[in-house]
Each structure stands twice: as structure tokens, then as C-alpha cells.
Amino acid sequence: MGSVTSKTNDELESFLNKRLGGSMTSSNKTVSVLLGAQWGDEGKGKIIDYLIENHKINVTARCQGGNNAGHTVVANGRKYDFHILPSGIISPTCFNVIGNGVVVNLDAFFSELAHNGILEESGWEKRIMISSEAHLVFGVHSQVDGRQEDSLAAKNKIGTTNRGIGPTYSSKCFRNGIRVADLMADFEEFSEKYRRLVEHYKKQFPSIEVNVDEELAKFKQHREKLAELKLVGDTVGFIHEQRNAGKQVLVEGANGALLDIDFGTYPYVTSSNSTVGGACTGIGVPPTAVGNVIGVVKAYQTRVGTGPFPTELFDSDGEKLQTIGKEVGVTTGRKRRCGWIDLFLLRRSAMINGYTAIALTKLDILDTFPTIKVAVGYKLNGQVLSSPPAQANAWGAIEVEYKEFEGWNEPTVGVRKFEDLPEKCRQYVKFIEDFIKVPIVYIGVGAERESLIVRQQ
């Protein structure tokens, strides 16, 4: 029996490099991932816009979700509302990818291009590609979404956007889903697949009404337009080529980490992986390609729809956050529920995603609050928890432990250096940073692109 040799880390790495024919540490980390770290609506669009303009981003890519998510970007003297389009579409130097992990509603795609004035720009079609492997959202999916939500008791409703996102992902897993590639291939075969899909759902929900011929005629027009503009392609291969050429890729996560299908407040979650793993599977890059992971965090907490929200406020402070913060959903138009920032959940979010930096947004909304609280721990039945409950019913019995801060009662809008923020404001930021052990690099103090403090590059 051979002897066991103890190797140092350097010796082990050298050994593996020889066996693997390369370096473990020199991988081409040209992919950055930007994720919502809470329940969505954190202000991702603004940070994405800043990164594109200031960090030479060559490609932006959507990796999951559909037109159920919403980004708002204020730039070029106007406000843009994005649901399925990557935010880089407003930059003439940026290429945009809708990845295989996205579920694509083509009606919404073309409407969004028109709504945001993209169709009026010369050459826009040369800067965007839809993955041929992405699944299509049909009107029947939206109807099923509504029927499923209606069938739930009031206390069990998920708060879906009724955009058909969940049923489309269900079709994908059930393996009767229809992909963009199917639409672009033999149309008769596509039509037959579509008819079978409709029949499948009508057996479950007989009240569904679908004019199959009208729908197919519409998709034939979509097919012709996609082909004419050459908007569909192999996005995995394209991104691989861009990475090999040293181009910088920014992946835009939709929704938020606390809505992840696995790690969120299940079942009150979205239907895809909105954590960092979804970025890899949603555009087809290996984990070794990812360098920076930026978590976007609102300086307080919001949520749309139903589901656990331990720090939710039902008093004048909650109303004040909603009013000053203009907390209305971009996609649904529903008022967002508001509360104090939950650092216990945020630390869990950081644990799962490995954030290398945090972007703290809407700090200015707290400028006039005399007292500000942050959640730092949970108790359940008198027991201190080390992690959030995995069982849905347990959330209702959570006791929240808070740390209280005295407000700074000074305006922060217009501040561009961290040291120029009020001292009490800096203390608030530093406490968050120390608690989750991730540097806060970007701080939003207003809606405009320029209303941003950058602490380090």
C-alpha cells in the first residue's frame, strides 16, 4: 500500500493544473451578475444603467423570469419601463441578450420596444438576440395563471401577476412547452404543438376560451418579423464568443433573491431561480465565468402581493414609506407593502449568492424619519432562529428583534461622497455593511442616474 503524502495548497494546485491542463485561478471571469437581494423592486435598473455607462459593459443579458418583472431606468431625459428587455437596450454600444432561462411573451416584447421608443432608433435590431431555446408564453398560460389563483383560498393566494409566467415554467417542466426554436422551424408542427397545449389546459380548466386560429395567425406574424429582423439565435454560443474576446457581460437578474423558487419564502415565490445559480443556467455560462455578484438592496423593505413579511408596517411609518418612496409596482400597478429593512433575511441572501458588493438604493426616502429600525434576528416560540423558517405556516409566529437608529433628518439628495452624508446616516449604512459582511459600494440618493454615491470602484 502506497504512502500518503501531505501536500501544501500550492503543491496541490500545481498538481491539478498539470492534470487539468490549465490554471485553476486564471479563468476568464468576464461575467458580472446583478441581483435583487430582497423581494424585488430594489432599484436594479438604475444600478444596471450606471454600470453600463461607467464600466464598459459590452453585453447585458436577462437570464430568468418574463414580463412579470419590472425595471425602471431614468436616463436621456426620459423614463424607461422594462419588463422583458435588458436595460442595455438604451445604450448604443451595448448588445442585449434574452437568454434561454427567460420565458418570452412576444406580444409584450414588441409592445415594450414600441412603448420605450426603441423602434424609432436606427439599428436597434442589430443589438438584441433572443435565445432559440427560450420558452414562449401564450395567452392560454395567462388564463391558466388566473384560474389557478382564483381556485386558492384567500389566505393561500400567491399574489401572481397573472402574466402566465408560472404556467409557462410548468409547461417547461412538464415537457409540453414550446420554444422559440419551434416557432422559427416548421410552422405546421408548431401549430400542432400549440393545439395540443391548449387541449391539455382545457381538460383542466374547461372555461378557458382560446381562438386557436387567431392565435396561430398572430404567431405567424411574429415569426415573420423575428426572421426578417434576425432576432433569434444561439445566445449561448454568442456569449461564449464575446467572453473569449474579453468582452464584459452583465447578467440582469429579475425579481429578487427572496422570491427564488428554492430559497425564497415558498410557496409565495416566483417560478424561477432568481439567485446567482439562475444566472449560469439562464444564459449558459459556467460558475467559473462569474466574477462580481452585486446585490441590490433597498434601504427599507417592500413586497408586492401576498406572502410573509415580518417587518411590514401597518402604521403611519408604513404609509409614509409608500408615499415618499412612490411604492407602486411597475408591472402590476399595485401598491407595495412597506416595512423596515430585514437584515436577518439579507444575510441569508448574501450567504446564498456570495455578493461581492452591495448597492443600497433609495436611502434618501428615510431622510425625514425620526426613528429608523432594522431587523437583526428572529424568534419562533421563544427560540432564537439561526435561519429563516422553511415551513410556510411558521412565518406567522415569528417575533422580530430590532435595532433602533435615530434618524438624521437632513436631505441626502445631491450628496455624491460618502463622507458628506450626515453622520447618523453613515452609521446606518455601516451597520448594514458590518451585519451582512459585504461592502456597500453604491448608494442611491435619488431617482436620476447621477444620484449615486460610489464608495470604491
Curated annotation (Swiss-Prot):
EC number(s) for this protein? 6.3.4.4
In terms of SUPFAM superfamilies, this protein maps to:
P-loop containing nucleoside triphosphate hydrolases
**What family does this chain come from, according to its entry?**
Belongs to the adenylosuccinate synthetase family.
Cite the binding residues for Mg(2+). 41, 70
What the protein does comes down to:
Plays an important role in the de novo pathway and in the salvage pathway of purine nucleotide biosynthesis. Catalyzes the first committed step in the biosynthesis of AMP from IMP.
Quote one Gene Ontology molecular function term.
magnesium ion binding
Name under which the protein is recorded: Adenylosuccinate synthetase
Which GO terms of the cellular component aspect does the record hold?
A: cytoplasm
Q: Which residues bind IMP?
A: 41-44, 68-71, 161, 175, 255, 270, 334
Compartment(s) where it occurs, according to its Swiss-Prot or TrEMBL record = Cytoplasm
Recorded hits in PROSITE patterns, A to Z, give:
ADENYLOSUCCIN_SYN_1, ADENYLOSUCCIN_SYN_2
Keyword annotations for this protein, in alphabetical order, are: Cytoplasm, GTP-binding, Ligase, Magnesium, Metal-binding, Nucleotide-binding, Purine biosynthesis
Q: Which cofactor does it need?
A: Mg(2+)
Presence of the UniProt keyword Hydrolase in the record: no
> What gene does this protein come from?
adss-1
Span of the secretion signal? none
InterPro entries per the record? Answer: Adenylosuccin_syn_GTP-bd, Adenylosuccin_syn_Lys_AS, Adenylosuccinate_synth_dom1, Adenylosuccinate_synth_dom2, Adenylosuccinate_synth_dom3, Adenylosuccinate_synthetase, P-loop_NTPase
| Reaction catalysis annotation | IMP + L-aspartate + GTP = N(6)-(1,2-dicarboxyethyl)-AMP + GDP + phosphate + 2 H(+)
Q: Which Pfam families match?
A: Adenylsucc_synt
Q: Which ranges form a coiled coil?
A: none
Q: Enumerate the residues binding substrate.
A: 330-336
Among the record's GO biological process terms, what is one? 'de novo' AMP biosynthetic process
Q: What organism is this sequence from? A: Caenorhabditis elegans
Q: How does it assemble?
A: Homodimer.
